[in-house]
Amino acid sequence: MTDEKNLSRQDIGMIGFEIVAYSGDARSSLLEAIKCAKRGEFDKIDDLVKDAQENLNIAHAKQTEMLALDAQGKDLDIGFIMIHGQDHLMTTMLLKDIVYDICEIYKK
């Protein structure tokens, strides 16, 4: 976590890009898990979900860093990239919550 009192809009944007990148990689893994289920390749699902979770953990840590800075009263000039990152992260977390259910439907 940064010790600066105020982060620049560019710094915050870079954190937003990281959240987009890691949650985007997680989303890709989760969608691939669903495709594997569709093809009957159920043995690949757990590894893909594990990979997704690792990326989500990193993205979530970045989000937590921003929340902690906000709670400390730091001035955060939040731009659209950070908002986009938050959207990516939350929708991917939702996808992870339901991916096993979707795969189970294909199993039947």
Language model features with spans:
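Terminal alpha-helical segments
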Residues: 1-108
